[in-house]
Amino acid sequence: MRIMGLDVGSKTVGVAISDPLGFTAQGLEIIKIDEEKAEFGFTRLEELVKQYQVEQFVIGLPKNMNNTNGPRVDASITYGSHIEHLFGLPVHYQDERLTTVEAERMLIEQADISRGKRKKVIDKLAAQLILQNYLNRNF
């Protein structure tokens, strides 16, 4: 059963996919979106859903450190509602506090990647961490 993890931002959506057994997550790509133009990357998501035979989604919820909803939580839930309606697949939500911070730390400490290159992969790695955290907690 393949699960797709998404890190939804205002300009990009980081995408990750689980292995068929649901043990590990791997970052796939970053989809550019434009909220102001109502371009949400659903066409590309549909291609990936078909390619990987996705059966469910996990979307990161950007909560505040005190467990209240951050400013992007509503946007993430709305995005989840759209993909649930479009694909008819279940959508789960995973607390994503500090995943982007953790992803950036990993890129600096383990890969020694420059700031410019980090911006190109950070959302994909954050999606991977969101999905891996979900897999670790649920399987």
From Swiss-Prot:
Species assigned in the record: Streptococcus pyogenes serotype M49 (strain NZ131)
One Pfam family per UniProt: RuvX
Keyword DNA damage carried by entry: no
Protein's GO biological process: rRNA 5'-end processing
GO molecular function ontology, one term from the record: nuclease activity
Claim: Membrane is one of the keywords in the record: no
Cross-referenced InterPro entries: RNaseH-like_sf, YqgF, YqgF/RNaseH-like_dom, YqgF/RNaseH-like_dom_sf
Family stated for the protein in its record: Belongs to the YqgF nuclease family.
Biological classification of the source: Bacteria, Bacillati, Bacillota, Bacilli, Lactobacillales
Gene Ontology CC: one annotated term: cytosol
Annotated compartments: Cytoplasm
HAMAP family per UniProt: Nuclease_YqgF (MF_00651)
Protein name as it appears in the record: Putative pre-16S rRNA nuclease
Domain of life: Bacteria
Keywords: Cytoplasm, Hydrolase, Nuclease, Ribosome biogenesis
Enzyme Commission designation: 3.1.-.-
Main subcellular location of this protein, as a coarse class: cytoplasm
Disulfide bonds: none
